[in-house]
Design a protein with these regions (language model features):
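Extended, small-residue-rich solenoid/repeat segments and analogous flexible loops
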Residues: 2-50
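Structural signal for interior beta-strand "rungs" in well-ordered beta-sheet cores
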Residues: 31-32, 36-38, 42-125, 129-131
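Arginine residue identity/basic-tract feature
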Residues: 6, 11, 24-34, 54, ...
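C-terminal segments of enzyme domains that contribute to small-molecule binding surfaces
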Residues: 79-90, 95-96, 127-164
Length: 164
């Protein structure tokens, strides 16, 4: 019975957090009440979905940005979890799947589906998300975009054997 009450409470808090303003205040507090471990100075965008059944399996470090409509799915059949380390950026509509660690300062681009861990200071893109660049500066709330873009170093793509 207590488990059912907790599940109902978690879903109600998720629904409220999904719609209310307060990316750095109210949403963060609501998700903490659900059991998500959230560091300091975290920004959670509008309509972000953090695992509805096992929010306690999600850990978010300091200075993380989770953009609008991102989804963090922390488990399928067993406790696996998601860890987002400090200074990471999760782009709009990105999906983070279970048993993944997003490294310090990593960037997940918009719409990417992350099914394996991301190295620190790495930019990933696509479905499934693949590394496309390294970055010398974390993409934070106050980061100058020009400075971030200048710090990017594209990764070499493996040869496909095709001629252009």
């Amino acid at each position: 019975m207590l488990s059912k009450i907790r599940q109902a409470k978690d879903r109600i808090l998720q629904l409220i957090a999904f719609h209310v303003p307060g990316a750095k205040s109210l949403r963060v507090r609501l998700h903490r009440c659900r059991g998500v471990k959230i560091g300091q100075n975290v920004w959670i965008g509008y309509q972000v979905l953090l695992d509805t059944s096992r929010p306690d399996l999600i850990s978010v470090g300091d200075n993380v940005i989770i953009s609008v409509r991102a989804m963090l799915i922390a488990h399928f059949r067993g406790p696996q979890g998601i860890t987002i380390e400090e200074d990471a950026f999760i782009g709009p509509g990105a999906i983070i799947l279970p048993n993944v660690t997003i490294g310090r300062g990593a960037v997940v681009t918009a719409g990417s589906v992350v099914s394996s861990s991301v190295q620190p200071m790495t930019v990933v893109q696509g479905n499934p998300a693949r590394p496309i660049a390294t970055c010398g500066v974390a993409l934070g709330e106050k980061t100058d975009m020009g400075q971030f873009l200048r710090s990017l170093r594209p990764l070499e793509r493996p040869s496909t054997g095709r001629r252009n």
